[in-house]
Amino acid sequence: VFGKSVKAMKFDIPTLVWKDKSGKVVTHPMCPDIDDTYEFRPQYLIKFLTAHLFGQNLWMHGHTGTGKTTFGEQVASRIGYPVWRMNLDSNMERSDIVGSKEIVIENGQPTTKFFEGILPKAMQMPCFLILDEMDAGMPDILFSVQRALEKKGLVLTEDGGRLIQSHPAFRFIATANSRGQGDEFGWYQGVRPMNLATLDRFGTFIEVGYLSKDQESKVIAKSFPQMAKDRIEQVVQFTKEIREAFQGGELSTTISPRGSHALCQYFLHMKDLMPDENQAMKSAVEAVITDRAPMDSKQRVVEIAQRCFQ
Protein backbone atom coordinates (compact mmCIF):
# COMPACT_ATOMS: atom_id res chain seq x y z
CA VAL A 1 0.00 0.00 0.00
CA PHE A 2 1.33 3.47 -0.93
CA GLY A 3 4.42 1.89 -2.48
CA LYS A 4 5.33 -0.15 0.60
CA SER A 5 5.40 -3.93 0.88
CA VAL A 6 4.17 -5.70 3.99
CA LYS A 7 5.56 -9.06 5.05
CA ALA A 8 2.70 -11.38 5.97
CA MET A 9 1.97 -15.09 6.41
CA LYS A 10 5.66 -15.97 6.57
CA PHE A 11 6.50 -19.26 8.31
CA ASP A 12 8.79 -22.22 7.75
CA ILE A 13 7.33 -25.43 6.35
CA PRO A 14 8.80 -28.95 6.23
CA THR A 15 10.53 -29.65 2.92
CA LEU A 16 12.57 -32.59 1.67
CA VAL A 17 15.85 -32.73 -0.26
CA TRP A 18 16.82 -36.05 -1.82
CA LYS A 19 20.38 -37.15 -2.62
CA ASP A 20 21.78 -40.14 -4.46
CA LYS A 21 24.59 -42.34 -3.13
CA SER A 22 27.21 -39.88 -4.36
CA GLY A 23 25.58 -37.02 -2.46
CA LYS A 24 24.16 -35.33 -5.54
CA VAL A 25 20.78 -33.63 -5.07
CA VAL A 26 18.16 -35.45 -7.15
CA THR A 27 14.40 -35.48 -7.61
CA HIS A 28 12.60 -38.40 -5.99
CA PRO A 29 11.00 -40.55 -8.73
CA MET A 30 7.61 -40.34 -6.98
CA CYS A 31 7.72 -36.56 -6.60
CA PRO A 32 5.32 -34.93 -9.13
CA ASP A 33 6.72 -32.71 -11.85
CA ILE A 34 6.42 -28.95 -11.33
CA ASP A 35 3.83 -27.33 -13.58
CA ASP A 36 5.12 -23.79 -14.14
CA THR A 37 1.71 -22.69 -15.43
CA TYR A 38 -0.09 -23.73 -12.24
CA GLU A 39 -1.87 -20.95 -10.34
CA PHE A 40 -1.98 -21.46 -6.56
CA ARG A 41 -4.94 -19.94 -4.78
CA PRO A 42 -3.62 -18.29 -1.60
CA GLN A 43 -6.74 -18.95 0.48
CA TYR A 44 -6.26 -22.70 -0.02
CA LEU A 45 -2.47 -22.70 0.10
CA ILE A 46 -2.25 -21.12 3.56
CA LYS A 47 -4.65 -23.74 4.99
CA PHE A 48 -2.84 -26.58 3.25
CA LEU A 49 0.63 -25.55 4.42
CA THR A 50 -0.57 -24.90 7.97
CA ALA A 51 -2.06 -28.41 8.14
CA HIS A 52 1.21 -29.78 6.75
CA LEU A 53 3.21 -27.85 9.35
CA PHE A 54 1.04 -29.23 12.17
CA GLY A 55 1.18 -32.80 10.81
CA GLN A 56 -2.60 -32.90 10.37
CA ASN A 57 -4.62 -35.08 8.04
CA LEU A 58 -6.22 -32.89 5.37
CA TRP A 59 -9.66 -33.20 3.72
CA MET A 60 -10.18 -31.38 0.39
CA HIS A 61 -13.70 -31.40 -1.04
CA GLY A 62 -15.46 -29.80 -3.98
CA HIS A 63 -17.11 -30.46 -7.31
CA THR A 64 -15.48 -32.69 -9.88
CA GLY A 65 -12.89 -30.84 -11.93
CA THR A 66 -11.96 -28.23 -9.31
CA GLY A 67 -8.39 -29.54 -9.08
CA LYS A 68 -8.29 -31.04 -5.58
CA THR A 69 -5.76 -33.76 -6.33
CA THR A 70 -3.69 -31.54 -8.61
CA PHE A 71 -3.42 -28.94 -5.84
CA GLY A 72 -1.83 -31.49 -3.49
CA GLU A 73 0.49 -32.76 -6.20
CA GLN A 74 1.71 -29.27 -7.09
CA VAL A 75 2.42 -28.44 -3.45
CA ALA A 76 4.33 -31.73 -3.17
CA SER A 77 6.35 -30.95 -6.30
CA ARG A 78 7.67 -27.76 -4.75
CA ILE A 79 8.55 -29.10 -1.30
CA GLY A 80 10.14 -32.34 -2.50
CA TYR A 81 7.42 -34.70 -1.26
CA PRO A 82 6.79 -38.04 -2.99
CA VAL A 83 3.11 -38.78 -3.63
CA TRP A 84 1.24 -42.07 -3.40
CA ARG A 85 -2.38 -42.23 -4.58
CA MET A 86 -5.17 -44.63 -3.71
CA ASN A 87 -8.54 -44.40 -5.42
CA LEU A 88 -11.07 -45.65 -2.87
CA ASP A 89 -13.66 -46.85 -5.36
CA SER A 90 -15.78 -49.98 -5.08
CA ASN A 91 -13.07 -52.08 -6.77
CA MET A 92 -10.53 -51.43 -4.03
CA GLU A 93 -10.04 -54.36 -1.65
CA ARG A 94 -8.41 -54.58 1.77
CA SER A 95 -5.56 -56.64 0.33
CA ASP A 96 -4.75 -53.78 -2.07
CA ILE A 97 -4.40 -51.42 0.88
CA VAL A 98 -2.70 -53.39 3.65
CA GLY A 99 -1.20 -56.27 1.68
CA SER A 100 -1.66 -60.02 1.35
CA LYS A 101 0.08 -63.37 1.64
CA GLU A 102 1.29 -65.06 -1.50
CA ILE A 103 3.03 -68.34 -2.23
CA VAL A 104 6.55 -67.86 -3.57
CA ILE A 105 9.40 -70.21 -4.36
CA GLU A 106 12.51 -69.80 -2.21
CA ASN A 107 15.47 -72.18 -2.51
CA GLY A 108 13.30 -74.41 -4.66
CA GLN A 109 10.61 -74.73 -2.01
CA PRO A 110 7.14 -73.12 -1.91
CA THR A 111 6.66 -70.79 1.03
CA THR A 112 4.10 -68.21 2.12
CA LYS A 113 5.30 -64.61 2.21
CA PHE A 114 3.51 -61.39 3.12
CA PHE A 115 3.70 -58.49 0.65
CA GLU A 116 2.88 -55.03 1.95
CA GLY A 117 0.14 -53.00 0.28
CA ILE A 118 0.13 -49.31 -0.56
CA LEU A 119 -0.70 -48.08 2.95
CA PRO A 120 2.15 -49.68 4.96
CA LYS A 121 4.65 -48.86 2.20
CA ALA A 122 3.66 -45.20 2.16
CA MET A 123 3.43 -44.87 5.95
CA GLN A 124 7.08 -45.77 6.42
CA MET A 125 8.42 -42.90 4.34
CA PRO A 126 8.04 -39.10 4.22
CA CYS A 127 5.32 -38.55 1.63
CA PHE A 128 1.74 -37.52 0.92
CA LEU A 129 -0.74 -40.39 0.58
CA ILE A 130 -3.70 -39.03 -1.38
CA LEU A 131 -6.94 -40.91 -0.73
CA ASP A 132 -8.96 -40.05 -3.83
CA GLU A 133 -12.77 -40.31 -3.64
CA MET A 134 -12.58 -40.82 0.12
CA ASP A 135 -16.34 -40.42 0.53
CA ALA A 136 -16.99 -43.23 -1.98
CA GLY A 137 -14.93 -45.79 -0.06
CA MET A 138 -16.53 -49.00 1.21
CA PRO A 139 -16.89 -49.17 5.03
CA ASP A 140 -14.50 -52.13 5.41
CA ILE A 141 -11.88 -50.25 3.39
CA LEU A 142 -12.26 -47.09 5.50
CA PHE A 143 -11.90 -49.06 8.72
CA SER A 144 -8.62 -50.42 7.35
CA VAL A 145 -7.12 -46.93 7.34
CA GLN A 146 -8.83 -45.54 10.44
CA ARG A 147 -6.12 -46.52 12.95
CA ALA A 148 -3.45 -45.13 10.63
CA LEU A 149 -5.37 -41.83 10.50
CA GLU A 150 -5.01 -41.65 14.29
CA LYS A 151 -1.20 -41.67 13.95
CA LYS A 152 -1.16 -44.80 16.12
CA GLY A 153 0.31 -47.02 13.47
CA LEU A 154 -1.16 -49.88 11.46
CA VAL A 155 -1.51 -53.44 12.76
CA LEU A 156 -1.01 -56.00 10.00
CA THR A 157 -3.10 -58.91 11.29
CA GLU A 158 -2.31 -60.77 8.08
CA ASP A 159 1.39 -60.65 9.01
CA GLY A 160 1.22 -61.89 12.57
CA GLY A 161 0.04 -58.61 14.07
CA ARG A 162 3.12 -56.65 13.00
CA LEU A 163 2.85 -52.97 13.88
CA ILE A 164 3.78 -50.37 11.26
CA GLN A 165 4.52 -46.93 12.70
CA SER A 166 4.06 -43.79 10.62
CA HIS A 167 7.11 -41.79 9.56
CA PRO A 168 6.99 -38.37 11.30
CA ALA A 169 6.77 -36.65 7.91
CA PHE A 170 4.02 -38.89 6.52
CA ARG A 171 0.75 -37.09 5.69
CA PHE A 172 -2.76 -38.15 4.64
CA ILE A 173 -4.69 -36.05 2.10
CA ALA A 174 -8.28 -37.06 1.34
CA THR A 175 -10.12 -35.72 -1.70
CA ALA A 176 -13.91 -35.94 -1.94
CA ASN A 177 -16.97 -34.49 -3.63
CA SER A 178 -18.68 -33.99 -0.27
CA ARG A 179 -17.95 -32.73 3.23
CA GLY A 180 -18.34 -36.28 4.48
CA GLN A 181 -22.04 -35.87 5.25
CA GLY A 182 -23.30 -37.52 2.06
CA ASP A 183 -24.12 -36.15 -1.40
CA GLU A 184 -25.69 -32.72 -0.91
CA PHE A 185 -26.41 -32.29 -4.62
CA GLY A 186 -27.71 -35.67 -5.78
CA TRP A 187 -25.13 -35.78 -8.58
CA TYR A 188 -22.40 -38.04 -7.23
CA GLN A 189 -23.33 -41.70 -7.38
CA GLY A 190 -21.58 -43.77 -4.75
CA VAL A 191 -20.90 -40.94 -2.28
CA ARG A 192 -21.68 -42.09 1.26
CA PRO A 193 -22.04 -40.32 4.61
CA MET A 194 -18.82 -40.81 6.53
CA ASN A 195 -18.42 -42.18 10.03
CA LEU A 196 -18.07 -39.16 12.34
CA ALA A 197 -15.11 -40.83 14.06
CA THR A 198 -13.33 -40.97 10.69
CA LEU A 199 -14.08 -37.31 9.92
CA ASP A 200 -12.78 -36.33 13.36
CA ARG A 201 -9.36 -37.65 12.39
CA PHE A 202 -8.97 -34.89 9.80
CA GLY A 203 -7.69 -31.67 11.33
CA THR A 204 -8.25 -29.31 8.39
CA PHE A 205 -11.00 -29.12 5.76
CA ILE A 206 -10.68 -27.10 2.53
CA GLU A 207 -13.61 -26.50 0.19
CA VAL A 208 -12.12 -26.14 -3.30
CA GLY A 209 -14.00 -24.14 -5.93
CA TYR A 210 -13.42 -23.66 -9.63
CA LEU A 211 -10.75 -21.25 -10.86
CA SER A 212 -11.84 -17.64 -11.33
CA LYS A 213 -11.86 -16.19 -14.85
CA ASP A 214 -8.65 -14.24 -14.19
CA GLN A 215 -6.87 -17.28 -12.79
CA GLU A 216 -7.89 -19.51 -15.67
CA SER A 217 -6.95 -16.84 -18.21
CA LYS A 218 -3.45 -16.68 -16.73
CA VAL A 219 -3.06 -20.46 -16.84
CA ILE A 220 -4.15 -20.68 -20.49
CA ALA A 221 -2.00 -17.71 -21.53
CA LYS A 222 1.06 -19.34 -19.92
CA SER A 223 0.33 -22.71 -21.49
CA PHE A 224 -0.54 -21.37 -24.95
CA PRO A 225 1.26 -18.05 -25.56
CA GLN A 226 0.46 -18.34 -29.28
CA MET A 227 -3.28 -18.19 -28.59
CA ALA A 228 -5.03 -14.87 -29.26
CA LYS A 229 -6.26 -13.00 -26.19
CA ASP A 230 -9.85 -12.79 -27.47
CA ARG A 231 -9.90 -16.56 -28.01
CA ILE A 232 -8.65 -17.13 -24.47
CA GLU A 233 -11.43 -14.90 -23.16
CA GLN A 234 -13.98 -16.91 -25.14
CA VAL A 235 -12.70 -20.22 -23.77
CA VAL A 236 -12.72 -18.91 -20.20
CA GLN A 237 -16.26 -17.56 -20.57
CA PHE A 238 -17.36 -20.89 -22.05
CA THR A 239 -15.89 -22.91 -19.17
CA LYS A 240 -17.41 -20.49 -16.66
CA GLU A 241 -20.90 -20.88 -18.13
CA ILE A 242 -20.58 -24.67 -18.39
CA ARG A 243 -19.60 -24.87 -14.71
CA GLU A 244 -22.38 -22.53 -13.64
CA ALA A 245 -24.91 -24.63 -15.56
CA PHE A 246 -23.50 -27.75 -13.91
CA GLN A 247 -23.70 -26.23 -10.44
CA GLY A 248 -27.23 -25.03 -11.17
CA GLY A 249 -28.38 -28.51 -12.13
CA GLU A 250 -28.88 -27.67 -15.83
CA LEU A 251 -26.04 -29.94 -16.94
CA SER A 252 -24.83 -33.32 -15.73
CA THR A 253 -21.33 -32.71 -17.08
CA THR A 254 -18.71 -30.05 -16.41
CA ILE A 255 -15.25 -29.03 -17.57
CA SER A 256 -12.09 -29.06 -15.47
CA PRO A 257 -8.92 -26.99 -15.94
CA ARG A 258 -7.52 -30.10 -17.60
CA GLY A 259 -10.50 -30.03 -19.97
CA SER A 260 -10.04 -26.37 -20.87
CA HIS A 261 -6.36 -27.11 -21.56
CA ALA A 262 -7.39 -29.95 -23.89
CA LEU A 263 -9.89 -27.64 -25.60
CA CYS A 264 -7.20 -25.06 -26.37
CA GLN A 265 -4.72 -27.69 -27.50
CA TYR A 266 -7.24 -29.26 -29.88
CA PHE A 267 -8.32 -25.86 -31.22
CA LEU A 268 -4.77 -24.76 -32.03
CA HIS A 269 -4.11 -28.03 -33.82
CA MET A 270 -7.30 -27.83 -35.89
CA LYS A 271 -6.78 -24.12 -36.63
CA ASP A 272 -3.72 -25.03 -38.69
CA LEU A 273 -5.71 -27.63 -40.62
CA MET A 274 -8.96 -25.77 -41.26
CA PRO A 275 -9.44 -22.53 -43.22
CA ASP A 276 -12.22 -21.40 -40.85
CA GLU A 277 -11.06 -20.65 -37.30
CA ASN A 278 -14.62 -20.80 -35.94
CA GLN A 279 -15.03 -24.26 -37.42
CA ALA A 280 -11.81 -25.30 -35.70
CA MET A 281 -13.22 -24.16 -32.35
CA LYS A 282 -16.51 -25.96 -33.02
CA SER A 283 -14.56 -29.14 -33.73
CA ALA A 284 -12.59 -28.72 -30.49
CA VAL A 285 -15.75 -28.23 -28.41
CA GLU A 286 -17.32 -31.33 -29.96
CA ALA A 287 -14.26 -33.49 -29.31
CA VAL A 288 -13.61 -32.34 -25.74
CA ILE A 289 -17.08 -31.58 -24.34
CA THR A 290 -20.13 -32.24 -26.52
CA ASP A 291 -19.36 -35.80 -27.60
CA ARG A 292 -18.87 -36.98 -24.01
CA ALA A 293 -21.90 -35.17 -22.61
CA PRO A 294 -25.02 -37.25 -21.83
CA MET A 295 -27.91 -36.86 -24.26
CA ASP A 296 -29.84 -34.66 -21.82
CA SER A 297 -26.93 -32.17 -21.71
CA LYS A 298 -25.75 -32.02 -25.33
CA GLN A 299 -28.15 -29.34 -26.55
CA ARG A 300 -27.40 -27.06 -23.60
CA VAL A 301 -23.65 -27.39 -24.23
CA VAL A 302 -24.19 -26.51 -27.91
CA GLU A 303 -26.23 -23.42 -26.95
CA ILE A 304 -23.53 -22.18 -24.57
CA ALA A 305 -20.81 -22.81 -27.17
CA GLN A 306 -22.72 -20.94 -29.89
CA ARG A 307 -23.15 -17.94 -27.61
CA CYS A 308 -19.54 -17.85 -26.40
CA PHE A 309 -17.79 -18.54 -29.72
CA GLN A 310 -19.99 -16.59 -32.14
What residues fall within each predicted segment?
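AAA+ P-loop NTPase catalytic core and its hallmark functional loops
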Residues: 1-230
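Alpha-helical lid/collar subdomain of P-loop NTPases
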Residues: 1-38, 42-45, 210-217, 221-310
